C-alpha cells in the first residue's frame, strides 16, 4: 500500500546521510471525511527510503508525516530488498511487518499494507519462536524470523524481526513498526536493530535523534550515530532517564498562565515518537480541555480555530527547564476546517500520573536519545 509518494530529492552535507520526504493526503483527513475517525481513535489508542548518502558514522534518514502528526520512513528487508513504510517508535522495541500470509481474525487478508514475501528472499530464515501482542480491543500474533534489513545505507544482516501472521488493525497508512526502545521491553525477545548495529560498531556514538518538521510535506529526519547541530537552536539540555532501559524522563510540572495544572508533585513522561498526541491521566486531560475551551465530540476535543490567538502556551517543565508549547503548535486543523486538541486520555493507564509526549511536543523540540549515557537531550527545533 502506497499512501505516500517520496520525492527523489537528496541533500548532502559533511558526515550526513539525508533522505528527504514528502507528505500527501493524510489518514486523519481521509477518516474524517468518511466519518470513521472516532471509531479509529476508540479502537486504536496508542500502543503503539529512497535515496541515501553516507559519510563518516552519522546516518540521517528521512521521515514522512502522515495522519497530520505521524511520521514514517522506508526500510527494506530481504534479498532482493522489499520496501516497507514503518513508524520509528521510541515506545517499543520490535521490528514488526506483516507476512504475505497475514490474516485478520475474520480470516480475511490483513490491511492493505505491503507484506513481506519470505519465499522471494534468499537470505531469509525461519525460527520456531513465536510472539503475541495484546492492544486495545485486538491482538497481534507472529513468529520471529531473520533477514537482511537496511535503513538507508545502514545494513543489519541476519536481523531478527517479527513477522505478523494475525492482526486486527484497521486499514493503516503504514506497513509496520521499527522499535527504538531498549531490549528489555521487546515482545518478541529479538535484539532490536539499533542494538545489533551498535554492537557491530556501525555507530561512532550510540545515539539517535529526531527532527520532526512542522511542514506538511518534507524535511523530517531520524539520524543515527550522531547529531546534526543545524536542526536545533541553542544548547541541548540533557535529562537522565528515570529507569535506564526505557525512554521515560521526570516531568516536574505542567503549567498554564504560570499556574500548575498537572504533575504538581512531579511525574514521569515517556518520550514517544510513535504517537501523534500528548497523552495523560483522564482527570488532568479533562481539566486541560476546560482550560482551553475544548468541547468533546465522541473521542475528540474540538476548539474554535479563532481561539489560537487568545489561548496561552502550555509549559512542560523538565529537569528544571521550561518547554512551552504554544497554541499554534497544539491546535491542529483537519480537512473539515475544525481545530482539535491533541491532549488525549492515556487509555493504557487512564488513572496514573504518567504521560506520553508525542509528536505535538517533538515537532517543537529536537530530541536526542543517548543509549551510552541513558539520557535524552532536548533543544528548540529550527
Swiss-Prot record:
Glycosylation site positions: 57, 74, 128
One matching Pfam family: Asp
Annotated family: Belongs to the peptidase A1 family.
Coiled-coil parts of chain: none
Propeptide, chain numbering: 16-53
Signal peptide (residue range): 1-15
Source taxon at top rank: Eukaryota
Tissue specificity comment: Trophoblast and placental tissue. Produced specifically in the invasive binucleate cells of the placenta.
Disulfide bonds: 102-110, 263-267, 305-339
Gene3D superfamilies, A to Z: 6.10.140.60, Acid Proteases (2.40.70.10)
Organism: Ovis aries (Sheep)
Subcellular locations according to the entry: Secreted, Extracellular space
TM annotation in the entry: none
Keywords carried by this UniProt record: Disulfide bond, Glycoprotein, Secreted, Signal
This protein's name: Pregnancy-associated glycoprotein 1
Domain Peptidase A1: 71-379
Ancestral active site (site feature) positions: 272
GO molecular function, one term: aspartic-type endopeptidase activity
Biological function: Has no proteolytic activity.
Gene Ontology cellular-component terms listed: extracellular region
SUPFAM superfamilies on file: Acid proteases (SSF50630)
GO BP: proteolysis
Amino acid at each position: 500500500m502506497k499512501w505516500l509518494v517520496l520525492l527523489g530529492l537528496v541533500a548532502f552535507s559533511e558526515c550526513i546521510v539525508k533522505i528527504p520526504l514528502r507528505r500527501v493526503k493524510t489518514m486523519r483527513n481521509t477518516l474524517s471525511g468518511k466519518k470513521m475517525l472516532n471509531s479509529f481513535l476508540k479502537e486504536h489508542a496508542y500502543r503503539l527510503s529512497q535515496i541515501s548518502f553516507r559519510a563518516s558514522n552519522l546516518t540521517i534518514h528521512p521521515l514522512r508525516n502522515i495522519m497530520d502528526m505521524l511520521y514514517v520512513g522506508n526500510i527494506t528487508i530481504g534479498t532482493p530488498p522489499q520496501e516497507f513504510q514503518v513508524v520509528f517508535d521510541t515506545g517499543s522495541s520490535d521490528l514488526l511487518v506483516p507476512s504475505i500470509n497475514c490474516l485478520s481474525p475474520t480470516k480475511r487478508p490483513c490491511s492493505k499494507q505491503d507484506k513481506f514475501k519470505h519465499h522471494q528472499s534468499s537470505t531469509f530464515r525461519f525460527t520456531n519462536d513465536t510472539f503475541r501482542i495484546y492492544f486495545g480491543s485486538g491482538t497481534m500474533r507472529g513468529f520471529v524470523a531473520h533477514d537482511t534489513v537496511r535503513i538507508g545505507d545502514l545494513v543489519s544482516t541476519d536481523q531478527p524481526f517479527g513477522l505478523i501472521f494475525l492482526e486486527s488493525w484497521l486499514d493503516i497508512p503504514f506497513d509496520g513498526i521499527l522499535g527504538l526502545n531498549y531490549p528489555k521491553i521487546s515482545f518478541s525477545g529479538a535484539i532490536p536493530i539499533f542494538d545489533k548495529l551498535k554492537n557491530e560498531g556501525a555507530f561512532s556514538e550510540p545515539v539517535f535523534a529526531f527532527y520532526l518538521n512542522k511542514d506538511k510535506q518534507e524535511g523530517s529526519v531520524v539520524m543515527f550515530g550522531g547529531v546534526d547541530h543545524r536542526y536545533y537552536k541553542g544548547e541541548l539540555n540533557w535529562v537522565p532517564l528515570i529507569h535506564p532501559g526505557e525512554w521515560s524522563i521526570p516531568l516536574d510540572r505542567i503549567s498554564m498562565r504560570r499556574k500548575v495544572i498537572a504533575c504538581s508533585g512531579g511525574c514521569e513522561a515517556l518520550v514517544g515518537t510513535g504517537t501523534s498526541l500528548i497523552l495523560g491521566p483522564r482527570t488532568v486531560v479533562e481539566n486541560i480541555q476546560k482550560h482551553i475551551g475544548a468541547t468533546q465530540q465522541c473521542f475528540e476535543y474540538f476548539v474554535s480555530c479563532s481561539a489560537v490567538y487568545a489561548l496561552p502556551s502550555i509549559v512542560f517543565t523538565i529537569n528544571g527547564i521550561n518547554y512551552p508549547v504554544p497554541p499554534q503548535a497544539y491546535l491542529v486543523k483537519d480537512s473539515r476546517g475544525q481545530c482539535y486538541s491533541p491532549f488525549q486520555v492515556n487509555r493504557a493507564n487512564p488513572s496514573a500520573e504518567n504521560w506520553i509526549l508525542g509528536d505535538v511536543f517533538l515537532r517543537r523540540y529536537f530530541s536526542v536519545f543517548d543509549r551510552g549515557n541513558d539520557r535524552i537531550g532536548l533543544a528548540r527545533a529550527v
